[in-house]
């Protein structure tokens, strides 16, 4: 285990907090190392088998939840509402696709966010930017915005509560498509939280104990970076966001690092191209990965490439643009011989107005805006996004 940690720590790690009290970081990491794993190896194996079915075209995935989770929303009522929305969207997706649907939440650990800037100006004051509840506070006060390592422990405890409320108490023993707890996932970002939760079972298998299904984002997918190094070592299925600027060579090198044995369902690529770029940029990438022999699941993130600023000054996204990208995504993937496996959405069960239906609705954005970071789809908007899959053309599979 020490050798693994050394290999990861010698790599460059981007988007990491600058903790204000190093002694508190030491204590927090010790707590995380001594705490129980949030997930079990047997569940990882079940999830990998389930995702292999998706990679074979036998099931679909709906992955959704908050952009940034609120650690104060770890009580049963909050978790129940989020799980109910996931169930509703999965049911809708099942009707649309006529296939079983794997339910995955952006939940029980989505407490940190990468940011473009280190600071922001609020009025006349320059403050550290908010990086998620696991790192610092939201209030526009310097004391709240300092990076506080004690929040790592709060994040673990909140995730533990959420896991229990989701129903992860008893061994699974079967492939979980319906009638069982939703799988958990989050962006594997803060290594001071993730590394102490790396575990090794009796058979010597290394796994990440913080979540069932970790992913890395556009800002941390560097081939020689610490995040890729860690994902390459763990038993968990893994995922990576893919934007319009990645080259075929970069993507193939990334796939080789994360999926060297070409195992179906081991690696999922989450395309976040933007509605106006996906048709041109995605097909060559899908074809290159297919020809390299990787049994990849492709998911569409139709939100992050389509963020704009509303008249009120808040970030927003238009549902029309989101559905346009979903339609273009599926056509791009299936025409290139890939497996279009489902959707990755930022959603909330609350009746918010963070996303607009179209350009005419931009003036309504902000009247009910509660997101801690990026705009989310409310339930009706999320259903519209899921239904957009039905408008896509049927697959035309291409053999290797």
Curated annotation (Swiss-Prot):
InterPro entries in alphabetical order? Aldolase_TIM, DAHP_synth_2
Q: In which pathway does it act?
A: Antibiotic biosynthesis; phenazine biosynthesis
Signal peptide residues on this chain, from the entry's feature table:
none
State the EC number(s): 2.5.1.54
**Catalytic activity, per the record?**
D-erythrose 4-phosphate + phosphoenolpyruvate + H2O = 7-phospho-2-dehydro-3-deoxy-D-arabino-heptonate + phosphate
Supply the alphabetized keyword list: Antibiotic biosynthesis, Transferase, Virulence
One Pfam family assigned to this protein is DAHP_synth_2
Q: What enzyme category does the UniProt record give?
A: transferase
Q: Which GO terms describe its biological process?
A: aromatic amino acid family biosynthetic process; phenazine biosynthetic process
GO molecular function ontology, one term from the record: 3-deoxy-7-phosphoheptulonate synthase activity
Membership in a protein family: Belongs to the class-II DAHP synthase family.
Q: What's the name of the protein?
A: Probable phospho-2-dehydro-3-deoxyheptonate aldolase
| Species this chain originates from | Pseudomonas fluorescens
């Amino acid at each position: 285990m020490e050798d693994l940690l050394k290999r990861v720590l010698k790599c460059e790690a981007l988007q990491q907090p600058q903790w204000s009290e190093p002694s508190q970081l030491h204590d927090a990491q010790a707590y995380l190392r001594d705490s129980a794993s949030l997930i079990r190896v047997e569940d990882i194996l079940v999830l990998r088998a389930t995702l292999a079915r998706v990679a074979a075209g036998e099931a679909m995935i709906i992955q959704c939840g908050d952009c940034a989770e609120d650690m104060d929303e770890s009580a049963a009522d909050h978790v129940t509402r989020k799980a109910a929305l996931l169930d509703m969207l999965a049911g809708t997706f099942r009707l649309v696709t006529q296939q079983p649907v794997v339910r995955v939440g952006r939940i029980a650990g989505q407490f940190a966010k990468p940011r473009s800037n280190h600071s922001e100006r609020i009025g006349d004051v320059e403050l550290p930017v908010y990086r998620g509840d696991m790192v610092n506070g939201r209030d526009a006060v310097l004391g709240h915005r300092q990076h506080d390592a004690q929040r790592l422990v709060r994040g673990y405890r909140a995730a533990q509560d959420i896991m229990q409320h989701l129903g992860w108490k008893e061994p699974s023993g079967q492939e979980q498509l319906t009638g069982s707890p939703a799988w958990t996932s989050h962006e594997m970002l803060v290594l001071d939280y993730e590394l102490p939760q790396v575990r090794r079972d009796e058979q010597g298998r290394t796994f990440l104990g913080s979540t069932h299904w970790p992913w890395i984002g556009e800002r941390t997918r560097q081939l020689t970076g610490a995040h890729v190094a860690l994902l390459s070592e763990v038993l968990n299925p893994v995922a990576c966001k893919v934007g319009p600027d990645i080259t075929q060579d970069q993507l193939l090198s990334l796939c080789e690092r994360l999926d060297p044995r070409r195992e179906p369902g081991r690696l999922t690529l989450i395309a976040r191209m933007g509605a106006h770029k996906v048709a041109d940029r995605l097909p060559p990438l899908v074809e290159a990965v297919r020809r390299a022999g990787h049994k990849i699941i492709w998911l569409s993130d139709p939100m992050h490439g389509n963020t704009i600023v509303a008249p009120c000054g808040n970030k927003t996204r238009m549902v029309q643009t989101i559905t346009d990208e979903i339609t273009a995504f599926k056509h791009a993937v299936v025409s290139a011989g890939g497996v279009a496996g489902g959707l990755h959405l930022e959603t909330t069960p609350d009746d918010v107005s963070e996303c607009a239906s179209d350009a005419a609705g931009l003036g309504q954005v902000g009247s009910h805006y509660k997101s801690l970071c990026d705009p989310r789809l409310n339930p009706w908007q999320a259903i519209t996004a899921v239904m957009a899959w039905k408008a896509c053309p049927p697959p035309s599979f291409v053999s290797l």
